[in-house]
Amino acid sequence: MASITNLASSLSSLSFSSQVSQRPNTISFPRANSVFALPAKSARRASLSITATVSAPPEEEEIVELKKYVKSRLPGGFAAQKIIGTGRRKCAIARVVLQEGTGKVIINYRDAKEYLQGNPLWLQYVKVPLVTLGYENSYDIFVKAHGGGLSGQAQAITLGVARALLKVSADHRSPLKKEGLLTRDARVVERKKAGLKKARKAPQFSKR
């Protein structure tokens, strides 16, 4: 009996409330923001790159505006116009439309000076037929060109403008023909031959 009373007194002396905590044990993890957060400089760079990709470059905006301008000036597209001419040179082909205006030249929806890289000779090629007849400030030139290089395209535009001016008046034929602006330049690069380095260049001959 004494052992039972001793056991009961020892159990009553224990306080479970003091040993058991009110909150369960919790494991603290670091916040996701602190682990994956970018440095301030890299975050700024990322935001700048995102804004740069969203905003379109000014060149594309100019092309879009010129496209709208050309469509407003040429209802129905190039094929529906009356004063039109096609010119060719080497591998280049140019479709030219003339409209009464102030002398603007637009090639592939870009300003001629920008498209021809500011080359004065190529810019002169484009306006030679108009200058010959004194119309350099009387017509706007709209061009769709493809194939070849810029030099070939500029010379193809020359022929296209001259042919388009014939549709304005048949009296233009004589002065344009006198300047050789209605002649199609049929010269193209000569093909390479087998056994030669180029079209005609041969390897050095050795007799012995």
Swiss-Prot record:
Task: Give the UniProt subcellular location, in the record's own words.
Answer: Plastid, Chloroplast
> Which InterPro entries does its entry note?
Ribosomal_Su5_D2-typ_SF (IPR020568), Ribosomal_uS9 (IPR000754), Ribosomal_uS9_bac/plastid (IPR023035), Ribosomal_uS9_CS (IPR020574), Ribsml_uS5_D2-typ_fold_subgr (IPR014721)
Q: Which domain of life is it from?
A: Eukaryota
Q: Which UniProt keywords apply?
A: Chloroplast, Plastid, Ribonucleoprotein, Ribosomal protein, RNA-binding, rRNA-binding, Transit peptide
Q: A single GO CC term, please?
A: chloroplast stroma
Q: One GO MF term, please?
A: mRNA binding
Q: Which terms does the UniProt entry file under GO BP?
A: translation
**Regions crossing the membrane:** none
Q: What range does the transit peptide cover?
A: 1-52
Q: Does the keyword Glycosyltransferase apply?
A: no
Q: Is the Metal-binding keyword given for this protein?
A: no
Instruction: State what this protein does.
Output: Binds directly to 16S ribosomal RNA.
UniProt cross-references to HAMAP family, sorted A to Z: Ribosomal_uS9_B
Similarity annotation = Belongs to the universal ribosomal protein uS9 family.
Indicate what this protein is called per its UniProt record.
Answer: Small ribosomal subunit protein uS9c
- Name the species this protein comes from: Arabidopsis thaliana (Mouse-ear cress)
